[in-house]
C-alpha cells in the first residue's frame, strides 16, 4: 500500500487524478471539501431563435463578469415538437439574497418567452437532464474547449443551427473559468484550465 499526495509520490498522485488508467488500485480517498449551502438558485430563460446572435453575444460578455458563485450556460435547441429557441441557464451557489442582482440582466438579453427560476437542492440540479430526456440514451455529442466566444463563432453556430432540418439538434456553451481556471495547467492531468468555455 502507498499513500500518495502532492508531497508524497507526486507523479503517481498526478496520474491518479486523471492521467489515464493502470497506475494502481485505489482503496480509499481523502477529499478536501469546500463549504457550500445545500440549496442553489437555478433557472432557465428562453428567447426566440431570431434573437440568437444577440443573446449569445450577451452571454459571451456577461459570463466573464459574474462572480465565481454564478455559472451561466447558453444553448440553441428545443424539445421535440417545440419551436427551437435560444436560452440561458444558470446556477447561483452564493447567498440566495444576492442572486437576483445577477439574474436580472439575463432578462434584458432579449425578448423573454419563457422563464423558470427556482431554489433547488444542488444534487437535484446536478442530476437534472440525466433521466429527463430519453433522447440522451441515443444521442451523439462532440465537444471541445475554447478561451473565448467570438462573434464569428456565434455567426457560424447560428448559421449552421438554422440550416439543420432536424430540430432535435442542440448546441450548448458551458461556462467554465473561475476557480477551475486558477489551477495551473500542469497541476493536474486536465490541461484545459485556461479555457473559459
Predicted regions and their residues:
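Soluble FAD-dependent oxygen oxidases
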Residues: 1-197
